C-alpha cells in the first residue's frame, strides 16, 4: 500500500487528520516554534527546520515518544525568509547528525516565497550542489530537495 502524505502549516489541521486518516504521514510546513514542539512530534512525522535549538528540542520530544522525527533543513538562498546560511552548512549538519531521534530527509529553500521574484535555475543548481556536498562529506543520503511552493514548478519541469 502506498503511503499517503499531507503537508500543512497549521497544527490544528493535523489534529483533524489524525482522526480521519491516522496512518497518513504529516508534513508540518512551518518552522516549529518552542511552544509547538510537543505537538509537532505528536501530530506529524516531518517538519521543516533551520535552527539547531529547535531541532534539539524536537530530538528530545521524539526521544520521549520513542520515535524518529524526520526533518528537511532549510537553507537561505536569497529570499531572506528563513534558513541557515550556506557557509554554516557543514557545521550545522554535523551537529544535527549527532541527534539520535532526528532523521534528515533532505534540504530545502523557500524560493520565490516572499520577494515575488521567480526562482532561477542557478538557485535550483545551488540546492543540488549543496545536497551533493553534504552527501559526500557525511556519507549519508539526502533523498529530498524542497525548493518552495508551486512558483518553482514551471522551472523544475523545464529542467528535469
Descriptions of predicted regions:
Residues 1, 61, 69-70, 76-157:
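Active-site loop/helix belt of alpha/beta enzymes
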Residues 14, 56-61, 65, 118:
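Active-site-adjacent beta->alpha loops and helix N-cap segments on the catalytic face
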Amino acid at each position: 500500500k502506498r503511503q499517503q502524505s499531507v503537508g500543512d502549516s497549521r497544527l490544528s489541521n493535523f489534529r483533524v487528520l489524525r482522526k480521519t486518516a491516522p496512518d497518513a504521514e504529516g508534513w508540518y510546513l512551518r518552522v516549529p516554534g518552542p511552544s509547538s514542539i510537543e505537538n509537532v512530534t505528536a501530530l506529524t512525522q516531518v517538519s521543516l527546520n533551520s535552527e539547531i535549538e529547535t531541532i534539539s528540542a524536537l530530538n528530545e520530544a521524539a526521544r520521549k515518544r520513542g520515535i524518529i522525527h524526520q526533518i528537511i533543513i532549510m537553507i537561505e538562498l536569497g529570499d531572506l525568509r528563513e534558513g541557515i546560511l550556506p557557509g554554516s552548512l557543514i557545521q550545522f549538519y554535523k551537529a544535527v547528525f549527532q541527534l539520535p531521534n532526528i532523521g534528515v530527509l533532505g534540504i530545502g529553500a523557500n524560493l520565490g516565497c516572499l520577494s515575488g521574484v521567480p526562482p532561477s535555475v542557478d538557485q535550483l543548481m545551488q540546492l543540488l550542489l549543496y545536497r551533493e556536498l553534504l552527501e559526500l562529506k557525511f556519507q549519508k543520503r539526502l533523498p529530498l530537495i524542497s525548493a518552495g511552493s508551486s512558483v518553482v514548478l514551471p522551472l523544475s519541469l523545464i529542467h528535469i
